[in-house]
Amino acid sequence: VDVTDINTVSKTNLSGKAYKGSMPGWPGNMTGKEVLASMIDMAAGTEKGYDAQYGYDYAQLVSKFTMGGVFYHQACDNYLDEKMNADNKPNDKPYKDGAYYTGKEHSWDEAFGYWGAAAHGATLSPKQNYDITKKKNMRDADANGDGLVNLKSEMNYAHAYYAAGFDKGGNTNYYNTITKAFIDGRQIITDAKGEKLSDAQRRGVKRHARTICSNWEKVIAEAVFKYAGSVYSNIEAVKATMGGNMWKVKGSAEKTEHQAALRKYAKYWGCLLYTSPSPRDWMV
């Protein structure tokens, strides 16, 4: 890869981008920002992010919460929602002084960044996109052929990676559907050539936004279904190592097997707990 310092990719403070409403699924009636800080604080007091006492796998809790409470929330409840309105982030003005892109271009591109697809991902198969994320196919990741993988533009992340994983089974086409809608919506904004979007153009942009977010939500639903199945399977695995009572697990081999089952259960429960999207009203 061409990056050794993550700050060269982005210095964004994600806590400030978290869902600002109450998160009832976490104790204390906290906001999204407070939940994220709380998880990180508690993870710091554990061994490798795993809390054996309460069965929390913070590596999963933090990553999955961030994907829903920051990435999906920001894209579909902010950049592709109110920021596509006529009176918000106008297209006939630079995003800020000195910027060579408009407010609408910036907002649309921000949402694409949260989606997490490689810039050339739409030219690849689902398996290629999946293997790129798994670092099993770095040749196809290297779009410009410079012998390096650019982590900002040539790698898949987060829900885009999930989509590729589901699509490679051949029954869905989430990755390309969402990515193409991003490309087509961006083209409408580009074709306006720095002028205000017409009502027809804005309707077209919002139509693509609905395609993006409705399919993105399906990706999340698929993940919930997957993790729910994993939780059930791991409950059965835990039962099998308990012999009816966890305190009766005897012998180092049995104890190790039991602890491994508990860790898997905690991992997938953590995945399931905060895989769901944050509340939003963009579809209303």
Each predicted region: which residue ranges?
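Mature extracytoplasmic or organellar-lumen-exposed domains after removal of signal/transit peptides
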Residues: 1-276, 280
